[in-house]
């Protein structure tokens, strides 16, 4: 009889544990649903846009400074094929921030200066690598447009 009583008591305890577990999960789901509902009702159009932009940002971008020599891998679609074309040059300007951040890269191709503006978080930019750091004292290096030959070189910086 004592054994039956112990078994009955254990059975009641396990039933209590099971009901307690289901009750807590139900409460948690209700709380989660309540928080989600509150969060959904508080989202305005500007908050939705900010959240969407935050999701679109690339996570693994190197620190880029004006004066750096960078190699940008640009996706190019030719017919059905897609390939990555490297573009290497000196960063002469940085603009904006967040999702719309751009860099202007200048290089000399066959004696002619070529500048391209890249949106850093664009899907067209496949890769971005800093080849060497440049030592400059300006935020914009537009004066390089007027220089020819060796005068367009930027001194190398070793501390970054």
From Swiss-Prot:
<dbReference type="GO" id="GO:0022625">
    <property type="term" value="C:cytosolic large ribosomal subunit"/>
</dbReference>
<comment type="similarity">
    <text>Belongs to the bacterial ribosomal protein bL19 family.</text>
</comment>
<dbReference type="Pfam" id="PF01245">
    <property type="entry name" value="Ribosomal_L19"/>
</dbReference>
<comment type="function">
    <text>This protein is located at the 30S-50S ribosomal subunit interface and may play a role in the structure and function of the aminoacyl-tRNA binding site.</text>
</comment>
<dbReference type="GO" id="GO:0006412">
    <property type="term" value="P:translation"/>
</dbReference>
<dbReference type="GO" id="GO:0003735">
    <property type="term" value="F:structural constituent of ribosome"/>
</dbReference>
<keyword id="KW-0689">Ribosomal protein</keyword>
<protein>
    <recommendedName>
        <fullName>Large ribosomal subunit protein bL19</fullName>
    </recommendedName>
</protein>
<dbReference type="InterPro" id="IPR008991">
    <property type="entry name" value="Translation_prot_SH3-like_sf"/>
</dbReference>
<keyword id="KW-0687">Ribonucleoprotein</keyword>
<dbReference type="InterPro" id="IPR038657">
    <property type="entry name" value="Ribosomal_bL19_sf"/>
</dbReference>
<dbReference type="InterPro" id="IPR018257">
    <property type="entry name" value="Ribosomal_bL19_CS"/>
</dbReference>
<dbReference type="InterPro" id="IPR001857">
    <property type="entry name" value="Ribosomal_bL19"/>
</dbReference>
